């Protein structure tokens, strides 16, 4: 099929590349001419395992192209995907200007029946607004052209997005037109061979499904962080509690890992947007507010532990950080716990030596050259000249470190384990003080 995708960000680029991989002819549109030229040269703007190879392969084959030209891209597409950003507005609600701008462009150039497919994460009711925006432009042109609008939210995990796109566990299609559903079934047939993963519903339910999924996952994380904070105060070990409750099949082990808080481009924004949407309809979503509040508090946890270790005297101290991206297998630092930690350390007069396998360039882009920040090429280099070590992101490369080397290198041997990667007994046996999240005895928190 011929597909046009508006947006070459995370969702648009992954979706376009994966659709091309299945034999479709895809054009990705972006208003950033420099970005389009980089993509044409094979320069991928984000780190995502497996993405570069399928972009290069399909661009070389002619199945995937990039352009800034809107009119020919609209003429190309049997399906027109909207995959642009919906950043939080000043009040936390989703800013719809980019989505509606694309809808208006479609109405200005549409020449025949097509299906407009919204991939962006949007408030409930957006399909109606997109439909109205397209129709208004057609009316202004004094033409009558049929089109359908579908909500088809993405469920891509950063770090596993290509796999998620090629082998989806569900395909949500919100549509009120049988013709549109048939078009989506045809498009997704190669992804849907083993069993029918497509769940068809109305547009509003599909839009809410996306927000509800992310809010549920964020809720599980904040819940476990609450349990971890209780465990610290009662002398329990949250890791044992996690194993105990995870063995209940009604709960399971997914997303019940306590830590330094969640970040990224989705959970913080989507929980806040859903809460604001509820408020705009006269409902106070108190649970969502609590999820947000717990996460804000949890992002300050590592700084709290480090500050307590040094009796609040951080001026002149050097802290080694392992992990800068908000999660492993990405270079994304949006809302990353590492950012709040580094900024708090700097404000307290401390210096940071940091290592991340992929987020070095992004960190430099965000903070530039600073005397109080050294970005290192290897994990052990971050330890040189540091007083203590804080582990912020659970990259696999950090799972089995040489504790003896860490102890010998740090000035005050202590590990602040923001992801509970290590066994406290093993760390302490190696001669290091251990501070985890909710590990009871090792945190030495008094009531």
Model-derived features with residue positions:
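Structural/interface elements that position substrates and couple domains in central-metabolism enzymes
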Residues: 1-447
